[in-house]
Amino acid sequence: MKLLYLFLAILLAIEEPVISGKHHILRCMGNSGICRASCKKNEQPYLYCRNYQHCCLQSYMRISISGEEENTDWSYEKQWPRLP
């Protein structure tokens, strides 16, 4: 019987306590997105996370696939060509 109590004590010490209502949020794309089974209305799915869920990014996020940091200056001159 003592062995059973010792086994239960060790098992409870190893297990992480379960806290209801709190879920670990898995982040993706350099902490810009959230891994979800389905994206919200204002989010776009982009690639997949480690748990095969969608990496959901806000629709206004710009993604550079070249790996280089882009200049994100949104001035008027850079958006439209100059008129002669």
UniProtKB/Swiss-Prot annotation:
**Residues in the signal sequence:** 1-21
InterPro entries, sorted: Defensin_big_dom
Q: Which UniProt keywords apply?
A: Antibiotic, Antimicrobial, Defensin, Disulfide bond, Secreted, Signal
User: Which cysteine pairs make disulfide bonds?
Assistant: 28-55, 35-49, 39-56
Gene Ontology process terms (BP) = antifungal innate immune response; defense response to Gram-negative bacterium; defense response to Gram-positive bacterium
Taxonomically, the superkingdom here is: Eukaryota
Keyword check for Hydrolase, yes or no: no
Please state the protein's primary subcellular location.
secreted
Compartments, as annotated in UniProt: Secreted
Gene Ontology MF term list: lipopolysaccharide binding
Pfam families, A to Z: Defensin_big (PF14862)
Task: Say yes or no: keyword Disulfide bond present.
Answer: yes
| A GO CC annotation given for this chain | extracellular region
Family per UniProt?
A: Belongs to the beta-defensin family.
Q: What does this protein do?
A: Has antibacterial activity.
State the protein's name: Beta-defensin 119
Which organism is this entry from? Answer: Hylobates lar
Task: Give the organism's phylogenetic lineage.
Answer: Eukaryota, Metazoa, Chordata, Craniata, Vertebrata
